[in-house]
Amino acid sequence: MLGGSGRVIMVSGASRGLGLAIAKRLHEAGFTVAAGARNPAAVAVKDRLSADRYDAEEAGSAEAWVEAVATRYGRIDGLVNCAGINPKVRVMDAGEESLDQMWRINVKGPLRVTRAAIPHLVKSGKGRVINVASLAGRRVGSNVGYAMTKFAIVALTHGIRQELWDSGVRATALCPGYIATDMTAGETEVSREDMTQPEDLAEMVETLLCLPNNLSVAELLVNCRKESML
């Protein structure tokens, strides 16, 4: 197993929710964490934990963030693409504004960060990319727009694995169900107590980052309740 000492991991969406829980967990485990957030001032900066502005909707934001992290630390060993949104978009809904925004943030954002970081991940020899997808990326519920973006991020993850495997880069699509964060605050189908806790999921992310090159997980499906597909 790989450890955290000396390894630099970028985490997007790190100012709240799951991204914040992941950043905290990795920092506690000895990783150097580079947090990316629209409001970096919301991140409590400390030794081995920096914060930079990153907006997944802005085309140049990914490159600027990666450059800042690489300049600061001299290396990048992994990415956790966690930034995302989930407005309701049904098949018959008029207008495409919300759908387009989800594609920019949930799909193009992770793609841009990964592209910018690839030279550093390859140089690491043990580069890691963890894309936070969803069980909505494995089966479709009422929010078809969200599911479309999460199916796409699973596809992106497999594309990264295929193209960069021989360079030592490993990628995992993490597919959780309901997580007890502000994104699910309005959900009534599952109680908050029954939802997966972000701190528990963050521990799984740490484990994925510590797996050696010859022990790679392509997809990790995580459910908090009985699912027809699991």
Model segments located where?
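Conserved glycine-rich cofactor-binding loop
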Residues: 15-16
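Conserved glycine-rich Rossmann-like NAD(P)H-binding loop of the short-chain dehydrogenase/reductase
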Residues: 29-45
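Conserved NAD(P)H cofactor-binding loop of Rossmann-fold oxidoreductase domains
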Residues: 82-87
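Substrate-binding pocket helix/loop in short-chain dehydrogenase/reductase
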Residues: 90-91, 98-103
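Active-site helix of classical SDR
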Residues: 114, 149
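Residue(s) in the substrate-gating loop at a strand-loop-helix junction
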Residues: 134
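C-terminal helical subdomain
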Residues: 166-169, 173-174, 190-230
